[in-house]
From Swiss-Prot:
InterPro entries membership: CBD2, CBM2/CBM3_carb-bd_dom_sf, CBM2_carb-bd_dom_sf, Glyco_hydro_5, Glyco_hydro_5_CS, Glycoside_hydrolase_SF, Glycosyl_hydrolase_5
Main EC class the enzyme belongs to: hydrolase
Region (Catalytic): 32-376
EC number: 3.2.1.4
Keywords, comma-separated and alphabetical: Carbohydrate metabolism, Cellulose degradation, Glycosidase, Hydrolase, Polysaccharide degradation, Signal
A GO molecular-function annotation: polysaccharide binding
Active site, renumbered: E180 (proton donor), E303 (nucleophile)
Family: Belongs to the glycosyl hydrolase 5 (cellulase A) family.
Stretches with biased composition (Low complexity): 377-407
Signal peptide from the UniProt entry: 1-31
Entry protein name: Endoglucanase D
Organism of provenance: Clostridium cellulovorans (strain ATCC 35296 / DSM 3052 / OCM 3 / 743B)
Biological process terms in GO annotation: cellulose catabolic process
Disulfide cysteine pairs (residue numbers): none
Amino acid sequence: MIKHLLSRGKLLLFVSVMATSSIIAGGNAYGSTAFTGVRDVPAQQIVNEMKVGWNLGNTMDAIGGETNWGNPMTTHAMINKIKEAGFNTLRLPVTWDGHMGAAPEYTIDQTWMKRVEEIANYAFDNDMYVIINLHHENEWLKPFYANEAQVKAQLTKVWTQIANNFKKYGDHLIFETMNEPRPVGASNEWTGGSYENREVVNRYNLTAVNAIRATGGNNATRYIMVPTLAASAMSTTINDLVIPNNDSKVIVSLHMYSPYFFAMDINGTSSWGSDYDKSSLDSEFDAVYNKFVKNGRAVVIGEMGSINKNNTAARVTHAEYYAKSAKARGLTPIWWDNGYSVAGKAETFGIFNRSNLTWDAPEVMKAFIKGIGGSSTTTPTTPTTPTTPTTPTTPTTPTTPTTPTTPQSAVEVTYAITNSWGSGASVNVTIKNNGTTPINGWTLKWTMPINQTITNMWSASFVASGTTLSVTNAGYNGTIAANGGTQSFGFNINYSGVLSKPTGFTVNGTECTVK
């Protein structure tokens, strides 16, 4: 795992999100999760809401330009497909080196900045989280005492510009201070580095966090990810990590291509799934959990995945188990996709074909989403009870409990409590139109339990009258397509006593089925 990572130096990522007051693309107004404010909630809640992620690798991190490493220009349609598959976080790799001026100001090229921002808004348009970092900056970001003064000065200038540009974005934008900072070319580059390297990385993390916080606004309380040396989960690197200012809104960033000989080494094993394999992976996650999560420090696995060795069955088993095991320990995994999927070659982490908007490894993707506890809207739901040829279908006699028995309810609502903590909870609501005509503009009403109060809502607006709540679509999600189209919104609540679901749901005055 460690040496192989050296060869993928070009494949790592920087995710950047920037602040705009209004950007329009494809007829949709950006901002569904862009300007939601920054909540004062535990970092673990944010990580839980991120659920599972996908890296737009080898694109904005490509040296020289967006398409220099063979991937097409990023489109809104690409990110739509990622969201439809079940991913809730976009990590967007960006290299700033080559797009900034000389010392002492290191002025970032605004055309580059705005392109990164445009792509990030594709994700916000899909109610996603976005991570922004510094990616391939190894030419100047060197973890040595001799380089420390110069690097700190440049880090401060660069992060100050990025943070100021993104100041108005809410807590669905997460900054990541660096990507895999390490002593490039050293014999211990991928094996923990030296004490000097680890200490200087801690100082760089502190410099970046302080620069971000100093810009004020939402950045004063924004959630920020910081890596260990090389983003390694080795005991040496995680034990020596120092959290800047012991900031409660700092999240640990790790990369875990585990196990290396299966996930990354083209000459390694192509099989995975034994009891030993699973217990070994569990042990790696346990070490991270016991060091950080157990002690109140949230963790995101910013990069992971497996390469294509003509071993789909093993990759499916690995992807599902990896996601399930990570989630059980409160870790959010983000798949590294570099757009390269040719079987039998090195670095073939690609699972999504950006040229034709299809999945190169659909089974792997579905297993990964399944493991995290989600489902892909790109996969039609199959009936659990097949119709037998001896029993003709009749409109008056439903034959299986999986078939809706209320044909008059053309709309169904899924009310899902996605997370709860103490006296608070997060809820996601999805409205599905099973009818044959689109819904153009919707108002969803329900009766709230008397012990619950909504504190904030995104992708919709609400009015409360007693215990009756009326929720109306935002400007960009008012149309729900016919024959299975969906729109979603979410909110947080405070509650006392038992956390129960509301009752009496109607959409535009008509009762609907509730799940």
